[in-house]
């Protein structure tokens, strides 16, 4: 196995594997950072000794989990592996650009780690708001390195997005209409469009911040006629679509897993599912200022952003009820991926409900920057995106490797993880309602109980991560071959066996469309 196979690969399966391995590794780093946060907050008083270090850890935790764990795994890993197989394409539209998209990520990660190592690190929060991110509050190269890291990750995602859009539209067999492609393909396509439209705005915002810091421009400095609120608008115009970028591929995975383990040929309401994802993608761009209810916007502006945000709950509800309808009347197989998918549906819905609470601008004035917000987005990310990743991984692991995971251990892993994340994040709702603010390393002792509970939960989640590593080792050590796969006619990615040959669909796929 020559090293060139991995460095110079143009094979969508190899690049998908690279993304999965990189994402898993980054996930370990992000988990370690989150445990440092929970260790600091386990009891009142200082552990790390310095608020700047604490904020650097919080910032790095967010960036690592978002840009180097969730996105590479969901879009780069599952997307690269499955999209060509699902539409019958021999490879991605731009195979060498695909390779570059991946290899931009390790240098980007390196720059992010470097930013923590120089000066005092970037303790700005993942939003990197000026004036805290300006050259007075953050003198030195830390924030600049973080900005360059984001630029690289952004370029990687934009190139990947171009590739996925071109592939899904252009590389299908002529007889296959876009409305006959699987839902995961749709999810990745819509995600790619969101990336393509939102990332350039982030690039503009952080480039302006870079020049404010180094070239004496005043885009965000009132002294020169600038406005720090402009940065917030630019950042959140990217930042809100970004959270839908993180969850949409997860929606696609859950649709596949639920239909498969309910024994159904297709998910309930295919067209409704597609339109719901389109609606979520569109609405995601016109609600960004709900992150800014406390900056002093007009009451009519707040009213608009409140109602627009609530509208997103409608297509999201369409998806949740369609998943439940897919389950209805099916012969349910209680395999591990199904457990993850059911956990996803329940916990994502809980996270969505707290989101509806926060969409009310009047309530958000009180809850903004408290742990209620932290609890909300960790329910949709730590139990939405991560549960979707686990569902997809356990479901498609036999396809990726040709080996099967240990049934009992994966169920134990699910149980431990389920308890861990809920114990970690459910108490944070109480802390938020009691007024505990985010991004502080210490707190009044009235908040001790729920912080301690939360930190114990994080240790349980750590045990789950270690169990997962053991499960991976066990699967590769035992080498249990995959016997047979059911429902291959409606799950075309499995048609070539486990694992599929290095090159699939070298000759164009023959597609017959049955109208029934």
UniProtKB/Swiss-Prot annotation:
GO cellular component, one term: respiratory chain complex IV
Catalytic activity: 4 Fe(II)-[cytochrome c] + O2 + 8 H(+)(in) = 4 Fe(III)-[cytochrome c] + 2 H2O + 4 H(+)(out)
Membrane topology, as annotated: Multi-pass membrane protein
Primary subcellular site in the record, as a coarse category: mitochondrion
Cystine pairs: none
Record-listed Cu cation binding positions: 240, 290-291
Transmembrane stretches, start-end: 12-40, 51-86, 95-117, 141-170, 183-212, 228-261, 270-286, 299-327, 336-357, 371-400, 407-433, 447-478
Pfam families, A to Z: COX1 (PF00115)
GO BP of this protein: electron transport coupled proton transport; mitochondrial electron transport, cytochrome c to oxygen
Species assigned in the record: Formosania lacustris
Record protein name field: Cytochrome c oxidase subunit 1
Membrane topology, Mitochondrial intermembrane segments: 41-50, 118-140, 213-227, 287-298, 358-370, 434-446
Gene designation: mt-co1
